[in-house]
Design a protein with these regions (language model features):
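A glycine-rich, hydrophobic/aromatic-adjacent loop/helix-cap motif
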Residues: 2-192
Length: 192
């Protein structure tokens, strides 16, 4: 499936395969929002104001004493973070696990046949990567991350303790977990 930016449909440089890599420029420019809106009319995207409010609320809940912030990556953020980070560490979060519980009408599915992708859901544990963002760049980098992860509001950003390979907590990071009350949350039975 290919999406084209509706503001310039004849420009081949504006075309992106939905399975193609996300870039900082694509996120910063708002082109991703426009392409998704064009491909899936009626899919509710979060407004810039809603994303900014969500980011402010998340930062207001930041655990004290932190210089900068960690972000927990468990999927594509591991190999294509699109954000500048000062440090990268293997990390585990307790109380959350990867689950095919996020319905998507793009990328892995269509509006007629939505696909399922992984999201963090309650219970168990999850191994991934922690990315440390430095304080001077925190606002810009998290704004970019919110444009990516909070596109539809399917996630809730939560602060989670990050554990190293020995099980010791080395900080708290933002993890994007499925919103169980959201319309994109799907819980399949064992048979499915």
């Amino acid at each position: 499936m290919s999406l084209t930016d509706p503001s310039s449909p004849s420009d081949p440089d504006e075309e992106i395969s939905i399975s193609g890599a996300l870039t900082r420029d694509l996120l910063r420019s708002g082109k991703l929002d426009r392409m998704v809106s064009a491909a899936v009319p009626g899919l509710r995207l979060m407004s810039d104001a809603e994303r900014e409010a969500s980011l402010r609320q998340t930062l207001a809940a930041r655990p004290g004493g932190a210089d900068g912030a960690w972000v927990f990556a468990y999927g594509s953020l591991m190999w294509n973070p699109t954000i500048h980070h000062a440090e990268r560490r293997v990390a585990r979060v307790e109380g959350w696990h990867r689950s095919f519980c996020l319905s998507t009408p793009i990328g892995r599915g269509t509006p007629e046949n939505p696909g399922l992708v992984l999201a963090l859901d309650e219970g168990g544990h999850c191994d991934g990567v922690a990315l440390r963002l430095e304080e001077p760049h925190l606002s810009d980098e998290l704004s970019l991350l919110w444009r990516r992860e909070m596109l539809t509001g399917a996630y809730r950003p939560v602060w989670v303790p990050l554990r190293d390979l020995r099980g010791q907590v080395f900080g708290h990071g933002i993890a994007f977990v499925i919103d169980p009350a959201g319309p994109q949350c799907v819980r399949l039975g064992e048979a499915e």
